[in-house]
Curated annotation (Swiss-Prot):
Designated name of the protein: Cucurmoschin
Organism ancestry: Eukaryota, Viridiplantae, Streptophyta, Embryophyta, Tracheophyta
Function, in words: Has antifungal activity against B.cinerea, F.oxysporum and M.arachidicola. Inhibits cell-free translation in rabbit reticulocyte lysate system.
GO biological process: defense response to fungus; killing of cells of another organism
Keywords for this protein: Antimicrobial, Fungicide
Amino acid sequence: PQRGEGGRAGNLLREEQEI
């Protein structure tokens, strides 16, 4: 990930928080 929200780990973290 580059910023945390536009990468792969950022996507997983955002999905976990949304769910």
